[in-house]
A protein has these predicted regions:
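Repeated loop/turn-to-beta-strand initiation elements of outer-membrane beta-barrel proteins
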Residues: 16-20, 74-76, 115-119, 178-182, ...
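C-terminal outer-membrane beta-barrel translocator/porin domains of Gram-negative envelope proteins
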Residues: 46-56, 60-177, 192
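Gram-negative/organellar outer-membrane beta-barrel architecture
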Residues: 1-59, 64, 146, 159-162, ...
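Transmembrane beta-strands of outer-membrane beta-barrel proteins
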Residues: 21-25, 68, 82-89, 122-128, ...
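Transmembrane beta-barrel domains of outer membrane proteins
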Residues: 9-13, 23, 66-70, 109-113, ...
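C-terminal hydrophobic structural anchor segments
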Residues: 171-204
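Outer-membrane beta-barrel proteins
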Residues: 20, 29-35, 74-76, 95-98, ...
Length: 242
C-alpha cells in the first residue's frame, strides 16, 4: 500500500488533563501486489476479487472528532491514574463512493498502585468498530487488526482482521531493580464482522512475561516473551505496550 495523507487537527485543552479536538484529512491510498520477497502478496494467499478494496485507488475525505482525559501520574512511566480516549471518524470515498464508512475507537488505560509502591496492576481495554454505509464496504487496509507487539502479543503482526475488534489486556508489573521492571501479562481479543457476532468462546488469548528498562521518569525498551496457541514469540520494542 502506498499513499499520502494531508490534513490538520485542531486541539483544545479546557483543562490540563482534558483534550478535545477534531480534524479534516485527505487520504490518497493505492493498493496492489506486494514487493517484499519475504512475504507473499495478498492475491497469492487470498482471492483478490473478494478482498475489499484490493487493487483499488481510493481518495478519502476523513472528518474526525476526539476526546481524551489523561490522569496518569507519569505519562512516560505510569503507576497510577488512567488515560481514557474516544475517537469518531467519517470516511467519504471521493472516487467511486463504494467505500464510505464510520469508525469508532475507544481506548481505556487504568493503573492501580498496589500496597507496595513498587508494584502496579496495569489494565487496558480497547475497541474499534467500523460501520459501512448501505451497500458499501470497508477497505481491508482500514479494517482493525489484532496481533503483533501491542495487541495479542503471541500472534504475528496483523494476524486477525475484520470490521470490528475488541482487546483486553492486564499486566502485573513489579520493580526488580531501579532501572528494570518485570511484568506478567495476559492479552485476550477478537475480531468479527459485526459486534453481535463477538462471543466469549471466540476470544483468542496470549500470555507471557516481560522485562522493561526505564529511567526514573521515562520508558526505554521492553522484551516480551509471549505464548499463544500458535507458539512462542519474542518481542523487543522501544515503546511501551500501553
Amino acid at each position: 500500500m502506498k499513499g499520502t495523507d494531508v490534513g490538520a487537527d485542531l486541539l483544545w485543552h479546557p483543562r490540563p488533563a482534558l483534550t478535545i479536538g477534531g480534524g479534516l484529512w485527505h487520504l490518497d491510498q493505492r493498493t496492489g501486489s506486494g514487493d517484499d520477497p519475504r512475504y507473499p502478496s495478498v492475491e497469492d494467499v487470498f482471492d483478490g476479487a473478494t478482498v475489499a478494496g484490493f487493487g483499488a485507488d481510493t481518495n478519502f475525505l476523513r472528518a474526525a472528532a476526539r476526546a481524551e482525559l489523561d490522569l496518569r501520574d507519569n505519562p512516560l512511566h505510569p503507576h497510577a491514574g488512567g488515560r481514557y480516549e474516544i475517537h469518531f471518524s467519517r470516511y467519504e470515498d471521493r472516487d467511486s463512493g463504494a467505500f464510505d464508512f464510520d469508525r469508532l475507537e475507544v481506548d481505556v488505560q487504568h493503573y492501580v498502585p498496589l500496597p507496595n509502591r513498587y508494584r502496579t496492576l496495569a489494565l487496558h481495554a480497547s475497541g474499534v468498530f467500523t460501520d459501512p454505509s448501505a451497500g458499501d464496504q470497508v477497505p481491508f487496509q482500514q479494517q482493525p487488526t489484532l496481533g503483533g507487539s501491542h495487541a495479542l502479543r503471541g500472534f504475528r503482526e496483523f494476524r486477525f482482521r475484520d470490521l470490528n475488534s475488541v482487546l483486553l489486556q492486564a499486566e502485573y508489573r513489579w520493580e526488580a531493580w531501579w532501572a528494570l521492571d518485570g511484568a506478567l501479562f495476559v492479552d485476550v481479543g477478537q475480531v468479527a464482522p459485526t459486534r453481535r457476532a463477538m462471543t466469549l468462546s471466540g476470544m483468542e488469548a496470549t500470555y507471557g512475561i516481560g522485562f522493561r528498562i526505564h529511567s526514573n521518569k521515562a520508558f526505554v525498551s521492553r522484551l516480551d516473551l509471549a505464548f499463544s496457541r500458535e507458539g512462542f514469540l519474542p518481542l523487543l520494542r522501544f515503546e511501551h505496550v500501553f
